[in-house]
A protein has these predicted regions:
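Active-site-proximal specificity loops/subdomain of glycosyltransferases
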Residues: 27-71, 76-91
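Short acidic, S/G/P-rich loop/turn micro-motifs used as interaction or catalytic elements
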Residues: 9-12, 32, 75-78, 125-127
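A structural signal for short, well-ordered beta-strand segments and their strand-loop junctions
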Residues: 68-72, 116-121, 179-183, 223-225
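A short acidic (Asp/Glu
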Residues: 14-16, 35-37, 79-82, 128-134, ...
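Short beta->alpha connector loops
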Residues: 7-12, 50, 150-152
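Conserved catalytic core of nucleotide-sugar-dependent glycosyltransferases
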Residues: 78-167
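C-terminal catalytic/acceptor-binding lobe
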Residues: 1, 9-11, 160-238
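Short, well-formed alpha-helical segments that are part of the catalytic scaffolds
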Residues: 2-38
Length: 238
């Protein structure tokens, strides 16, 4: 198993390595020397590979691992929510071994279910927690924390500049009848508040075009898409 962290223009400002010090950062070859000052494991991605979607596919083709975990480089909160009688509390888990063991369990569950991917909830808000539904099989996943069985059956669609994780998720549900959504843990990232990475090219227009393409390809699986502040919120019909 490899924990793959695509990153760009964020040397010295990433946080994921603080939780997962043995993860592997995949960065443009021109930035390797910058990242090596802060990161234990750094792999150079050729400069001919441009954009997050081709980068993900390059990782899948070149990492020589069957089980690949994609994680963003800017983790903010990771752990679970403890629900008490009148309030809830965020419990942080920053123990690398805990996460490695959990990721291994998720891959094992996928094998038993005949699925090829799993994902952890990517927001820590209490309103997003459903204690009676710790695992969902008809839900969305994002590549902020996503595991993929790398046997060649599923690759990211490079016609999607963004929302490539939504597309592969919907394709998997269409093909396999479900997907493994882990909801009793969360892995939340900074995203828009951190310079570099996808923020360099993820514009409202780029997002809008990707969503239009998703709706065209999976019309019965998307019920609505609304813009909230800097992001689009996609409501799925699963």
């Amino acid at each position: 198993m490899i924990i793959a962290v695509p990153s760009k223009n964020r040397a010295g400002r990433t946080t994921t390595q603080k939780v997962l010090p043995n993860c592997t950062f995949f960065v443009p070859e021109s930035e390797v020397h910058q990242y090596e000052q802060f990161i234990k494991n750094v792999v150079a991605v050729p400069m001919t590979i441009r954009g997050i979607t081709p980068t993900r596919n390059w990782i899948l083709r070149n990492c020589n691992e069957k089980n690949v975990v994609f994680i963003d480089d800017d983790v903010k909160y990771c752990g679970y929510l403890r629900l008490d009688e009148r309030k809830c509390k965020k419990i942080e888990i920053r123990d690398e071994q805990f996460w490695i063991e959990e990721f291994a369990k998720f891959f094992s569950m996928c094998e038993e279910l005949k699925y090829k991917m799993w994902g952890v909830r990517t927001e820590s808000s209490p309103r997003a927690a459903y204690p009676y539904k710790p695992i969902l099989f008809r839900t969305y996943l994002t590549a902020s924390c996503m595991g993929l069985i790398n046997d060649g059956e599923y690759m990211f669609d490079e016609s999607y500049v963004v929302k490539e994780d939504y597309e592969i998720c919907l394709r998997h549900i269409r093909d396999k009848g479900g997907i493994l959504g882990i909801r009793y843990l969360h892995w939340e990232n900074e995203h828009w508040s951190t310079e570099g990475g996808c923020k360099d090219y993820r514009t409202i227009d780029v997002e809008r075009q990707a969503i239009k393409k998703l709706i065209k390809e999976y019309p019965s699986m998307i019920s609505s898409a609304k813009r909230t502040n800097n992001e689009f919120c996609i409501k799925l019909n699963l």
